[in-house]
Curated annotation (Swiss-Prot):
Induction notes from the record: Up-regulated by a wide array of pathogens and pathogen-products together with self-signals for danger or injury. Up-regulated in psoriatic dermal tissues, in dendritic cells of multiple sclerosis patients and in tumors.
Pfam families for this protein: IL23
Name of the protein in its database record: Interleukin-23 subunit alpha
PANTHER family noted in UniProt: INTERLEUKIN-23 SUBUNIT ALPHA, SGRF
InterPro entries referenced in this protein's UniProt entry, alphabetically: 4_helix_cytokine-like_core, IL-23_alpha
Main location group: secreted
GO MF terms, alphabetically ordered: cytokine activity; interleukin-23 receptor binding
GO cellular component: endoplasmic reticulum lumen; extracellular region; interleukin-23 complex
GO BP annotations listed: cell surface receptor signaling pathway via JAK-STAT; cell surface receptor signaling pathway via STAT; defense response to Gram-negative bacterium; defense response to virus; inflammatory response; innate immune response; negative regulation of interleukin-10 production; positive regulation of activated T cell proliferation
Record function comment: Associates with IL12B to form the pro-inflammatory cytokine IL-23 that plays different roles in innate and adaptive immunity. Released by antigen-presenting cells such as dendritic cells or macrophages, binds to a heterodimeric receptor complex composed of IL12RB1 and IL23R to activate JAK2 and TYK2 which then phosphorylate the receptor to form a docking site leading to the phosphorylation of STAT3 and STAT4. This process leads to activation of several pathways including p38 MAPK or NF-kappa-B and promotes the production of pro-inflammatory cytokines such as interleukin-17A/IL17A.
Lineage: Eukaryota, Metazoa, Chordata, Craniata, Vertebrata
Length: 189
């Protein structure tokens, strides 16, 4: 007869084969999330355009700056919040990942040879999608904030918009990576 531990592992086997890290109501595979979020940080920095000084006054395109998700103090991503209930924080991170994945798939980032699937931006897009799927509980769809419908950008706007989006993404994935590093170090079984 199989021991209870072996039975539990057998029950989890189909679940892990589907690539899910967060069963409904439980904690994620913190180490997997940590590794993927560290990769996202590296990709976000390598995807950043190599340009000189840019004047980034926030007076311009409100469409891509006002609705950008941020991880804030009240999101439960602090050590105590993660210990008590990590789901709110993970949902917030998931919302941000989906938001940036949509932006990277928009016309702001398409049509450029440097943005092909093997490019840093293409890899960044795929990694964002991978981590968001890793966080999505099976059979449970978190409410995602309304992704703003972007009007088509003009070619002359795209360089500045890319710069702003990638800069904001760098900050977001840096905080997410810290959350997952803490979770992997202190909350993993």
């Amino acid at each position: 007869m199989l021991g209870s531990r072996a039975v539990m592992l057998l029950l989890l086997l189909p679940w892990t084969a589907q690539g899910r890290a967060v069963p409904g109501g439980s904690s994620p595979a913190w180490t997997q999330c940590q590794q993927l979020s560290q990769k996202l940080c590296t990709l976000a920095w390598s995807a950043h355009p190599l340009v000189g000084h840019m004047d980034l006054r926030e007076e311009g395109d409100e469409e891509t700056t006002n609705d950008v998700p941020h991880i804030q103090c009240g999101d439960g991503c602090d050590p105590q919040g993660l210990r008590d209930n990590s789901q709110f924080c993970l949902q917030r991170i998931h919302q941000g990942l989906i938001f940036y994945e949509k932006l990277l798939g928009s016309d702001i980032f398409t049509g450029e040879p440097s943005l092909l699937p093997d490019s840093p931006v293409g890899q960044l897009h795929a990694s964002l999608l991978g981590l968001s799927q890793l966080l999505q509980p099976e059979g449970h769809h978190w409410e995602t904030q309304q992704i703003p419908s972007l009007s088509p950008s003009q070619p002359w706007q795209r360089l500045l918009l890319r710069f702003k989006i990638l800069r904001s993404l760098q900050a977001f994935v840096a905080v997410a990576a810290r959350v997952f590093a803490h979770g992997a170090a202190t909350l993993s079984p």
